[in-house]
Structure formats: C-alpha cells, structure tokens
Amino acid sequence: MKTQIKTTTILFTLLISMSAFAQTLKEARNFTDNEQYEKARGVFKLLLAKEPTNGDNFFYFGDLMLKMEYPDSAKILFQKGVDINATNALTHVGLARYYMYTWNDPKGAQEIAYAKSLVQTHAGKKGLDMAASRQVQIYLEIAETETWAVSPNYDDAINLTTVCEKLDSKNPEVFLVRGDSYYRKDPVNGTPAITSYNLAAKLDPKSCQANVRIGKLYANGKNMQSAIGFYNIAIKTDSTFAPAWRLKGEAQYSIMKFDSAQKSMATYLRLNDDPTARYNYCKALYKGGNYSDAIVQGNLALDKDSSITVVYRIIGRCYIESKTPDAVKSIEYFNKFFAKQKISGAPVVIADDYIDRGKAFSKNNQDSLAILDYLKALNVDTSRKDIYFDVATSYYKMKKYDKAAEFYKKKIDLNPANATISDWNAYGRTLFAQKDYANADLAFRKFTTMDPLNSIGWYWRGRANQYLDKELKSDSTRIFFETFFDLADKDREKNKKELITASIYLGGYFNVKKNFPCSKAYFQYSLDLDPANPANVDVKKILETDKDIKAATAADINTCRSTAAGGK
C-alpha cells in the first residue's frame, strides 16, 4: 500500500513538473512574441539548465537570438541542438533559418530538406509515430523559414500550410503563416493574406496576432489610418501585447500625429522597458525622421545595455542625416559600431555602414578616409555602384580631378539613359577643372538638352566655350552667356557670382566688337550688382578710363540680345 501511494505521489509530482515546464516554454515563446526579449532570454537559460537535451529549447532560443540580431549566438544554439538531438527536425530548421538569415540559401535548403525527411520518417511509422500537432509545428516553422531566403520559396511555404490544414484545420497558426507567405509573395495584392488572417482570428478570437498582421499589411501599403484601425482592434483584444502599441506609434509618427505617437510609445515602454524595447523605439523614431528623439532613446537603450551594437549604427545615421548634420558625432558612433561589431560579430556589417560613415568623413572634410570607406562598401556589396558619385565627389574635393572624372563617368556609364543633370554637371565641372574644355562642353550640352530652363547648364557651356574660342571667332560663347543671363537675371541675389562672370564677358565681347553702348551696359550691370566684388575693380577702371565706353550711352541690355542658344 505504501509503495502504491509513493508511486502515485512520484507520478503526480512528475506530471506537475512536466506541466510547469510546458507552461514555461510557452511563456518563453510568449515573451518573445511580445518583444520582451530579456525576459525571454532569462526563461530560455532556465530551460536549458532544466532540460539540456531538449532540441526545441535550442531552436526557440536560437530564434530569439536572430530576432535580437545576434546571428552568431543563434548559430551556436542551433548547432548545439543538432549535436545533442540530431533527430529533432526543429534543430535542423534552426540551422536553415540561420543560413537563410545570412544569405546562404543552398545550405539552408539542405537543412530544410533534411528536416522534412525526418518528419516523413517519423510520421505514421510504428514506434516512431509523430503526432499531427508536432508535424504541423515543424512544417509551419519550415514555411516561415523559407520566406527568409534571398530567393524565397513562397510556393512551398504555402503548400506546407495546406498540408498543415489537412492535419489540423483548427490551428490558427496555420492561417497566420499562410497569410505571411501570401503577403510576402505578393505585397501589392493583400487580399489572400487578409483572408487567411481573418480565418486565424475566427479560430482564436482572443488572439490579437491576426489584426496586428493586417495592420502591418496596410502600413506597408502606406495606408496608415487603416493600419491604426486594425492596431486598435488588436489592442482591444489584448491591451498587453506590446508590439501592437509600438506599431501603432510608428504609424502615428509617419502621419505626423506626434502627440498620439508618443502616448502609444509610452504605453509600449510601460509594458516592455527592456533595452531591446528602447532600441525598437529608437528605430521607429529614426524611420519617422525624428532624429533628435531617436538619439535620446538610442542612448537610453545603450545605458541599459551597451552591447546592443546596432543602436550605434542608428545613432550614427541620425547625426549625419539630420537637417543640421553633426559629422563628428556621426563618425564617433560609427567608430563605436565597428569596434563593437568586430568583437561580437553582430550585426552583419552592410555596405551602408561604410557609405554612411564615408559621408560623415566627407562632410568633415576627411575625404581620403571617405574614399576608403566607399571602396570598402563596394567590397561588401559589389552592386552598390550608386556610390560612384560619392567617390567622385570626394576626389573632386581633394582636387584629384582625373580620378573624379573617372568615377563620374563610371556612374554615367552604368545607365546613360538614366544619367541625371547632376551627373552631367558634375562630370562637366571635373573636365573643366582638368582644362578639357571640349569634352566639358559636351557634358554641359547633355545638361542643357535635358533641362534647357536650368540656367547653370548654359553658364558652364559659356565658360567652356570662353576657353575654346578665345579669339571670338564664333558667337557661341556670347549666345550661351546671354541665355544664362536671361534665365538667371530673375534671381540676381542667388546667381550673383555667375551673373558677374557672364556680364563681364559680354561687356568685353561687345567692346571687341565695338558695340560700346552694349559693352557699357553689361559692365555697368556687373558693377551695380556687387561693387565690392574683386572682379569689378577692373570693370570700374574700364568704365572710368576707356574713352569709347566713357563716351557711350549705355544701351538697354534687352536690345543687345542675339538669338537664343537653341540647339547649339
């Protein structure tokens, strides 16, 4: 009798222990979903200590590390799971997720194929029978993972949810994952995704996940009012779900409802004030263009946990992208980012990290360092040839005009049909600085053909031809400067420097042509525009000492015009 009571007591204790463990694993996943990452991490550490051979623990802990942007830590956990329990399909899904997160699709696909084979081996086999709920769990994680790839396999992900529906048609997760796959496959047509999300909501009306996803769908489509409406429905369903408040705040920021956004974010932080939450708030502020507040929140996140390396990146960007850039502070934070990243290996360095620091270096007139960073960016991502313009500009500032011209031309040659007036203007200016006036004029001609009402293109055609035709054999220079003059005279203050150059040339031109009234008119225009300009010292002498000009009556400048430049 005593033995029977003792056995019953042990079994009862075991059942309670197993139930507590199951709830704890569920709790850890709930913390993860609720973006309470520090709490989740604490629970996962306890789980690993309690059941160090349970592969699921390693999978979900590794997944948390990916969400926290610690891929190296995630890989260690996923690999440990495989080493400890190689027949647990989820551990292989974890490795697949890591590989696809780090752009290694082939290895990811191998792990997914192996995970599927494990499910098929265990499903329906005597002694190995895998429950339908377990098959669904694994297939849904595979489906989600397949949408992470560089070349996502959306169709297989959707097909897997169909398999899952046959196994368990009442599981709302099936329809959430299907909705995610549909939306990622076709972000323009959100109807299939919304249909799936609504099915999930019907199956689990106490969950806010479906309406949060519908809200995100509308937010991605820039329909913020509808997005906020669905976030409100989600919050009404579960007011403790922190991400709904964060997403609502982000949507409110994007439509400049700043007071409402701050209230939403305050609730988000009240529900979840761990360092990652502060990081998420910082990121939302940055995306909304609220750089000063993003810097404040970023530093608060770092005060809580200085190991969140990505925050240094965001603050560095804020300083260089603000209306009043602080290049020195931007460089400081990017330097900290690179130093921390080198130690932790996370997050992955991307081309934009070097590009943004390069822009800060250039803004701080450290263009040799800027060029080094731009070239590092190209090593990281060879497709980022859009930075050729930035490289060229730094070379131009350093007066290395040959290298500047080389990179401006590279930028143009990427797609000549899409070259902008800025491209042609910069290229022409660089050739002009090299005294290659003929090719400079060709570049400026492209400029004026594309935008004939932009005065600066005509100005630079005049400057180039001024050197090409020093003996005034052609009227081209005159025509270009006159066309510039007509366009620029409407805003004299803005164009003062260039107007003085053009009017002095035209004054000299008419003097040589012995049209003294027009010569006097242009010289007088230049002097009146800015008497203190050094170029007008000689102009004043000419007006006072040249007997022909002195004797002439200044003409109305409008009567001195020739025909417009047209197709010259």
State what each model feature region is:
Residues P517-F523, L527-N536, I542:
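C-terminal interaction modules of eukaryotic adaptor/scaffold proteins
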Residues M1-I10:
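Bacterial N-terminal signal peptides that target proteins for export
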Residues A551-D556:
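Flexible, disordered linker segments and immediate boundary regions flanking tandem C2H2 zinc-finger modules
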Residues L14, S19-K513, P534-K550, S562-K568:
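Alpha-solenoid helical repeat scaffolds
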